[in-house]
Amino acid sequence: MSRFEDIFNGLKRAHGCTYINDTPKNGEKLKGKSFIKREPVTSQLYENHLNGIEATLGIIPITDDNTCIWGCIDIDSYDGFDHQKLLAKINLLKLPLVVCRSKSGGAHIFLFSKIFIQAKLMRDKLIEIRAILGFGNDEIFPKQIELKSEEDTGNFLNLPYFQGNKTTRY
């Protein structure tokens, strides 16, 4: 559990929650309610996420000192996204990325760092990678390069592996 927390470390004072309403039909986006909770991120939240206890956990990658240890390109695709083709391209280019299926059926392309780096550096690198992979318009997390105040939370990304072994996000 602690390894999962370390890998998906982020803002400690707030997190995202998503409640899924129903099972989508082919080619449709999962419908649900997402919001930010301004309360501490705990080990129990990570455990609940992996055990499939709703709501899904969303982590805000940018921290209070405007650094992050991971970032993500969020490819929204609701029907027939070819994960194998994406993985083949990443492998061919020898990019240090991890791909997980997102709840929409698209992909979350993660870039991890061994140490916390400036959010701007992470965003800049992901923008470059996004262009190389041909996904120039897809979202990047962290979305911000700095939090403007103690009240600012940034944007969250739903983590992979909701429901652990039964997940569709792998």
Describe the predicted segments one by one.
Residues V99-H108:
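Short, conserved phosphate-binding/catalytic loop or strand-edge motifs used
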Residues L95, G105, N155:
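Residue-level signal for beta-strand positions within conserved beta-sheet cores that form or flank
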Residues M1-W70, G80-A88, N155-F156, Y161-K166:
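DNA replication initiation on ssDNA origins
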Residues T56-H83, L92, S113-Y170:
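DNA replication initiation modules
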Residues A14, A107-F112:
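Broad hydrophobic/π-residue packing in well-ordered secondary structure
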